[in-house]
Amino acid sequence: MKTSSRRKFLFNSLALTSFPFLSSGINGCTFEKNKLELALQIYSFAPLLFQNKLDVLMFPQMIKENYGINAAEYWSIAFMGKEKDKSFIKELQIRSKDYDIDNLIILVDNIDLKTMENGPSLASSEKVERDQSLSFHKYWIDIASEIGCHSIRVNLRSDESDDNKVLDNSSESISKLIEHSKGQGVSIVVENHGGITGDADWLVRLMKNINSDFVGTLPDF
């Protein structure tokens, strides 16, 4: 698939899976206090992000005033490279505090939006690639810590046909990430949304293999 076609496919997919219409549904409901706690994931508003109608800095106010929700979930791509600006991150901290928003998690996707190519994978059989991916994810662990998130979600994409090798590579990479993250109180979670992670038995083996309080799963229904 050509790059332009892949980009269009991604954007169209995001449009179909997003929920900019949530306002009427949520505002029309009443939830019994202490019975149900909700958070909003900025990925749900991806079309607005790509149309420059929404910025990460707008998110705390948006979910508080439009939906009455007190917890935010983020997506690495939504930062659009602005996470490299320390003043941007500081401003996100300030706005989150001003609107009494708890920041929970960053979904970390290593995708070049210009080429639509995947970046280095934590589950690769090539050590050089795994090391590159480790550096990328450690950076996002630091960002997550700065804005008060308790977790980042990682992907375990691999072309390796041997599931046991993918398990070993993934276990090694995540264990190294935990060495970096645990001092900051940030956990690493794996979502069942593609490839080997869709195998529940394999995912259980991964959790047991790593055996850490700083690793977990994120069910994708």
Regions found by a protein language model. Name each.
Residues K2-S151, K165, S175, K182, ...:
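N-terminal pre-domain/capping segments
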Residues E37, A71-A72, S171-F221:
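Acidic/histidine-rich catalytic cores of soluble enzymes
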Residues I77-A78, N110, S158-D159, G195-I196:
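Conserved beta-strand edge residues that scaffold enzyme active sites
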Residues K84, D162, G198-D199:
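Secondary-structure boundary/capping motif
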Residues I143-D163, Q184, V189-H193:
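Active-site groove signature of glycoside hydrolases
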Residues E160-I174:
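Active-site cleft segment of glycoside hydrolase catalytic domains centered on the general acid/base Glu
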